[in-house]
């Protein structure tokens, strides 16, 4: 139900073999390490994104090489809406190019339930504006 299955191809005992790496519980955290250009996104991340979309999960994707992963996620979501009971929405927040970004207001009063939420939001904003207070 939750597992992610990564296809593999490896050379062993003088012949090529196909297999699978099964990540049975992706909630326990996953880390993908490798040098630039080693195929981390192609071999692992893309499969995670696609399989989780097919299973109807929501995702928060940090796309360092925007729009690479965003394009894959968006197109796969368009082609596989059957995993969702409610039609999902796709949003992009792009700090490098705000013209390509959706807008949101994290301090809008509708998002605050009590004075503690307002205090914590103001405190976080002030710490980010003046790093000497940290």
PLM regions with names:
Residues 3-134:
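Switch/coupling segment of Walker-type NTPase motor domains
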């Amino acid at each position: 139900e939750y597992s992610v299955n990564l296809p593999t191809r490896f050379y062993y005992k003088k012949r090529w073999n196909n297999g699978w790496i099964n990540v049975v519980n992706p909630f326990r955290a996953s880390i993908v390490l490798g040098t630039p250009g080693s195929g981390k996104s192609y071999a692992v991340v893309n499969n995670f994104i696609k399989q989780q979309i097919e299973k109807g999960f929501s995702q928060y994707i940090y796309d360092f090489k925007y729009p690479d992963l965003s394009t894959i996620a968006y197109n796969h979501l368009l082609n596989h809406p059957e995993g969702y009971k409610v039609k999902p929405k796709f949003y992009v927040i792009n700090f490098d190019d705000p013209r390509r970004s959706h807008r949101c207001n994290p301090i809008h009063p509708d998002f605050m339930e009590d004075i503690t939420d307002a205090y914590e939001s103001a405190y976080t904003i002030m710490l980010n504006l003046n790093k000497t207070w940290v």
